[in-house]
């Protein structure tokens, strides 16, 4: 019995050895053993020895990945967080199943189809499995609403829920801001629709494209985004297999923003498809790259079936920027060091990058065997290094603030802001002083910060941002936080100088 690939008649001595070993273990081993599990583990170990981006993906994992990349799943249309051991609704999708049923941000879901969800230390996947299901099936929920101190029941019919990958708003006069969170199947359409909406009442002359923390996605999606920025035929990227088969991808001169000033924001977690976009724009001198050196992933993967619903995400080719540069960083020191280096990219100035033992990617051209280059896309304008301890403090503080906001809003829902989104954005942060004082009183004994007053402005602004998210959606969160964002400030300064 053959347990490993006998593809197209390939039958090497090593493959014979492996199949013989599997058969011996199955038929002659002294104890019963799950041979399928053993083969599964050995397959995973084999794949792990290839490169950092090849991976075994189980049927269950693949389903989750496909939902994210397809841009739709079947559920009840909420985002949630465990706060004080209870499942708290963070946001409700507009016109989604939960909004139609009358669910609000801040509501606590206590029971789903008879299963209690509180005081169980459940992880997100366990919770999701109870809320998701087949389209038009019903989930019975018991919900607690703090504002009226009541528990009530709702029957919610599961439906298709879109997963947005694009956030957009008018940054300032004649200037649009578009955040792309991943390159999914529908990202290109989302981008075009968002741009056209921005362009409706006033022609957009400047565009800030935010690719920070974008891990990549579908290569074709990145190509279609690049295609929006050029008025003549230009190279987007080149791919090449180990056998030297090379494909070149070009723009089509059919984009929605072929003229105008383009600024792309990147950081050390901008990877893969994000780097395709940044590299094409930079090499073709179409725009300005602002930020930190990018991740450095210049390898292309394909999903190939393994059987049983599992797939191998296998690296099948390299890609090069239009000028012929490879951006792939070395992984000769192992996968752990490879990802550690990536995590440090936001915390080193360019002259300190050499301490990471990586060279400049510009030295690597087609067919180069040199794996020890720096990798990534180097920005045209570099943003000053981030302080790790400051970012950790902000991360802890943000978690405290979000927990507070959802609890506070639920307790004060009837007395809170009733105006428009525009009016909300124009509110002074002093409007949130009462909430700030309450937050400070609740958290002053937590020893995480010597004096919360030192962060007063940041806390007030964050309270405003997270309240805005609950009231008006994710765009408001970006609009408020971007007001004090260093990358955005540099982009605006560049626009004003142009």
Where in the sequence are the language-model features?
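Cleft-lining beta-strand/loop regions that shape enzyme active-site pockets
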Residues: 5-14, 26, 30, 34-35, ...
């Amino acid at each position: 019995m053959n347990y490993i690939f006998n593809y197209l008649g390939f039958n090497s001595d090593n493959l014979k050895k492996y199949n013989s070993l599997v058969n011996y273990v199955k038929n002659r081993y002294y104890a019963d053993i799950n041979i399928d599990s053993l083969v599964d583990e050995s397959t995973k170990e084999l794949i792990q020895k290839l490169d950092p981006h090849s991976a075994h993906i189980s049927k269950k994992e693949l389903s989750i990945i496909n939902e994210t990349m397809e841009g739709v799943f079947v559920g009840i249309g909420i985002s949630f967080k465990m706060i004080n051991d209870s499942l708290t609704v963070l946001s409700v999708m507009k016109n989604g199943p939960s909004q139609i049923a009358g669910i609000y941000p801040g509501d606590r879901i206590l029971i789903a189809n008879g299963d209690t969800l509180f005081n169980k230390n459940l992880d997100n996947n366990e919770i999701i499995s109870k809320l998701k299901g087949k389209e038009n099936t019903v989930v019975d929920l018991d919900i607690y609403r703090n504002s009226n101190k009541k528990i009530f029941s709702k029957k919610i019919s599961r439906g298709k829920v879109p997963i947005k990958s694009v956030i957009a708003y008018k940054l300032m006069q004649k200037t649009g801001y578009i955040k792309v969170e991943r390159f999914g199947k529908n990202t290109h359409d989302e981008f075009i629709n968002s741009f056209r909406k921005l362009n409706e009442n006033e022609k957009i002359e400047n565009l800030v494209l935010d690719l920070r923390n974008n891990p990549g996605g579908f290569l074709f999606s990145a190509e279609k985004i690049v295609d929006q920025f050029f008025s003549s035929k230009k190279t987007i990227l080149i791919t090449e297999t180990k056998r030297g088969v090379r494909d070149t991808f070009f723009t089509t001169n059919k984009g929605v923003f072929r003229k105008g000033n383009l600024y792309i924001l990147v950081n050390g977690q901008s990877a893969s498809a994000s780097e395709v976009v940044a590299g094409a724009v930079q090499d073709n001198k179409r725009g300005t790259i602002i930020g930190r050196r990018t991740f450095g992933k210049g390898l292309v993967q394909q999903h190939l079936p393994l059987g049983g619903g599992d797939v191998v995400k296998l690296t099948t080719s390299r890609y090069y920027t239009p000028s012929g540069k490879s951006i792939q960083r070395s992984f000769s020191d192992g996968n752990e060091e490879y990802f550690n280096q990536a995590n440090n990219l936001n915390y080193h100035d360019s002259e300190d990058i050499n301490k990471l033992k990586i060279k400049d990617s510009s030295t690597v051209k087609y067919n180069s065997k040199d794996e020890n280059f720096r990798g990534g896309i180097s920005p045209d304008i570099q943003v000053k290094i981030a302080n790790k301890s400051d970012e950790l403090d902000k991360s802890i503080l943000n978690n405290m603030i979000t927990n507070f906001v959802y609890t506070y809003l639920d307790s004060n829902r009837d007395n809170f802001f009733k105006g428009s989104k525009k009016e909300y954005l124009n509110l002074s942060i002093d409007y949130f002083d009462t909430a700030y004082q309450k937050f400070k009183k609740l958290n002053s004994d937590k020893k995480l910060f010597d004096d919360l007053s030192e962060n007063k402005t940041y806390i007030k602004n964050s309270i405003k941002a997270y309240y805005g998210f609950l009231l008006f959606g994710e765009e408001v969160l970006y609009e408020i936080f971007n007001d004090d964002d260093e990358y955005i400030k540099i982009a605006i300064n560049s626009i004003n100088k142009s």
